[in-house]
Amino acid sequence: MRVTLVVLLALFLALQYRLWFGKNSLPDYWRLQQEVSNQKNTNENLERRNQLIYADIEDLREGEDALEERARNELGMVKKDEVFFRLVPDRNP
């Protein structure tokens, strides 16, 4: 009986060691759960960003107003016989 108890205790301790310190232990599992959570957050942020970009692309494909606005703001284009004034803020207030 005593030998069986010692063997069972040794087996229990060996399993506990593997559970806490071995390969694929609980701390590894918790770390991987955190990494998965972080990756899900990153994916959600990128998905929102992609949706905004797709909406912008669709707006540019369908509407002339968005295309004209982008040409004016980003490229500085103006219509024929139009004068465009851009006010630049003073760097030293």
From Swiss-Prot:
Coiled-coil region: 28-75
Q: Name one GO cellular component term.
A: plasma membrane
UniProt topological domain (Periplasmic) ranges: 22-93
Q: One Pfam family from the UniProt entry?
A: DivIC
Q: Which domain of life is it from?
A: Bacteria
Function, in words: Essential cell division protein. May link together the upstream cell division proteins, which are predominantly cytoplasmic, with the downstream cell division proteins, which are predominantly periplasmic.
- The protein here is known as Cell division protein FtsB
